[in-house]
Regions:
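Catalytic cores of RNA-modifying enzymes
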Residues: 1-197, 201-235
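Accessory RNA 3′-end/elbow-binding domains used by RNA modification enzymes
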Residues: 1-63, 67, 211, 215-339
Length: 339
């Protein structure tokens, strides 16, 4: 059973599960920042969060969008106060590379499921390219039967697994870019997609297969980008482990392994305030905007003081109203992560 590639479950910010090993309980600590993990195939997103949380001894951790166990690639993991910025990342664009296997439609819409229907037809590159514009822009998409979408309070994948008929309503999604990259043989096509929140690549592969009369499912899937995080930010699990062990041995600092919290807010304007105003914001109090640009500052802003991230606030009617305040006591990610 597979999980959706683009859903933030209610328990995404969760504690690491108890593995049942008789290890000495260590003291949890305040760790704040982002790890952009290059998740390996076979690992669930929840387990990846648990591993990172354990390595850092962090009190709190969560991910910014589930990645299927059979998928690899970019999984943004927030530690500590960074979990408050998860919604800003989840709402960002995603980019995927994926391979479609023609000739078989499966009940999970990926290689893990059972074959539900077959076709002898195989599309050529010209037919695939001619179809892609129909699947670009705002389109209607039905989520996979095996997905975390809720039906009368039940997850669709639980209903499907129990043998119940699952009828899911189509939803409007946005696909910004869809390209054919390669066709290594008649049975496979490799594509890239840049899409918005709520898009299922498994459904996209299924619908392309049906439209071409060839049927198909996702044979391989890799996520390359989520919001502000891209391939250059990714770090393999083995490297995270090595960096944490080096820091524990006094050969570095954990802060050097983390991206700053505000990395998740790259597209939000930044505003600097005085230490006195920063203290007021952290107490939940609004402060007056000052300076010649005060009258034109509008909307959501990220606020810093003395180079330290303070709050996410809203500028309105000549004042800044705090919406999320941050306490970065402890270990906090900083610019220029070392690898």
């Amino acid at each position: 059973m597979t999980l959706p590639i683009d859903t933030l479950p209610a328990d995404a910010v969760a504690a690491a599960p108890d593995e049942g090993r008789p290890t000495k309980k260590r003291q949890k600590r305040d760790v704040h920042g982002w790890i952009v993990l290059d998740k390996p195939i076979g690992m669930t997103s929840t387990h990846a969060v648990a591993v990172i949380k354990h390595l850092y001894g962090a009190k709190r951790a969560g991910h910014a969008g589930t990645l299927d166990p059979l998928a690899s690639g970019l999984l943004p993991i927030a530690l500590g106060e960074a979990t408050k910025t998860v919604p800003f990342v989840v709402d960002g664009r995603k980019e995927y590379s994926f391979t479609i296997r023609w000739g078989e439609e499966r009940d999970t819409d990926d290689a893990e499921g059972r074959v539900a229907a077959t076709s002898e037809s195989r599309p050529d590159a010209a037919a695939i390219k001619a179809l892609l514009p129909r699947f670009t822009g705002t389109i209607e998409q039905v989520p996979p039967r095996f997905s975390a979408v809720k039906i009368d309070g039940e997850r669709a994948y639980d209903l499907a697994r129990s043998g119940e008929t699952v009828e899911l309503a189509p939803r409007a999604i946005e696909i910004h870019r869809l390209e054919l990259v390669d066709q290594p043989d008649a049975d496979h096509a490799m594509l890239t997609a840049e899409c918005g929140k709520g898009t299922y690549v498994r459904s996209l592969a299924r619908d392309l297969g049906r439209a071409l009369g060839a049927l198909g499912h996702v044979a391989a899937l890799r996520r390359n980008r989520v919001g502000p995080f891209g391939e250059g930010d990714m770090i393999p699990l083995e490297q995270v482990e090595a960096l944490c062990h080096r820091a524990a041995a006094g050969e570095g600092h954990l802060a050097d392994t983390l991206l700053p919290i505000e990395t998740a807010l790259d597209d939000i304007p930044a505003l600097a305030v005085s230490p006195a105003d920063a203290a007021r914001l952290q107490r939940g109090q609004a402060v007056l905007l000052r300076g010649r640009d005060a009258s034109i500052v509008r909307g959501i802003v990220q606020v810093a003081s003395g180079g330290q991230f303070v709050a996410i606030a809203e500028a309105e009617r000549g004042e800044i109203v705090p919406r999320r305040v941050f306490n970065l006591a402890g270990i906090a990610g900083r610019a220029g992560r070392k690898g």
